[in-house]
Amino acid sequence: MNKILNRREAVKLLGLGAVGVVTGSSLMCQQEKTHIITLSYDDGFEKSSIKTAEIYEKYGLSACINVIASRHLDQSKLPDEYHAWPVGDFELWNELKSRGHEIMPHSYKHANLNEVPFEEAKDLIRKCMDVFNDELEGFVEEESIYNFAYNASNPEIEEWLSAQVRAFRTGGGAINPFPYEGMKKLTCTSYGPDNIDKHLEETISKFLEGPSGWLIYNTHGLDDEGWGPVSSWFLDELLERLTEMKHVAVLPVAPALDLA
């Protein structure tokens, strides 16, 4: 099991520098931004999502929250042991969206689409989109970002989905090219099932030492919730440092794509 950092260790390790500020709402001086960071929160745990939104708002940022369309309807049916915490419903998702946070689909029932036939995979995505169309205010399927459960996809389902949505997130390398027109496939890294503080810090530090690009890190819950949780205190301090860097933008996926 990886070691959970305390505050002093994290501050020492992080060393991310400081100058400037960027917010998801203003997107000011984007010509100066060379590194984009998206923390993409999956599964929609109620307590974690509320706390995540509060931490992001503290720094004028918008969180990227991806929710399972049917989980709130029957919380007794768990995809696996890492989903054993209460999730939010669309009343919460609409509230967070109205506060400027990105709420996007993360499957209908958290099925691995590599393990079902193609037609069934399409049907599950359509069911997911139907729920979002009915429940999430202002949702436009063609402008949405679909986040695959388990970051599991294949060329056949990716080709079909590309015509349905603006972009999709799946497994692969952590670093994507800087956003460009028509960008569809986004890849990400993740870590778990233990606490991710150290891995996340190391991943970001390495990214910031390299050339321009877009880091997408798939996060889940906070503190004790979900697979590979991040400590809320660590997230708070991380965002404080990142927002002080002139060349860094911390953005949800859609605003990042808008930079193309």
Model-derived segments and their meaning:
Residues 37-44, 81-82, 112-115, 188-192, ...:
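The substrate-binding groove and active-site-proximal loops of carbohydrate-active enzymes
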Residues 43-46, 70-73, 109-112, 150-154, ...:
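Solvent-exposed loop/turn segments at secondary-structure junctions
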Residues 32-102, 124, 129-148, 241, ...:
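Active-site beta->alpha N-cap acidic-glycine motif
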Residues 36-38, 213-219:
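Generic beta-sheet signal
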Residues 48-51, 56, 112-205, 234:
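Catalytic domains of cell-wall/extracellular-matrix polysaccharide-remodeling enzymes
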Residues 58, 167-180, 205, 209, ...:
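C-terminal domain-boundary segment and adjacent tail
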Residues 2, 9-29:
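N-terminal export signals
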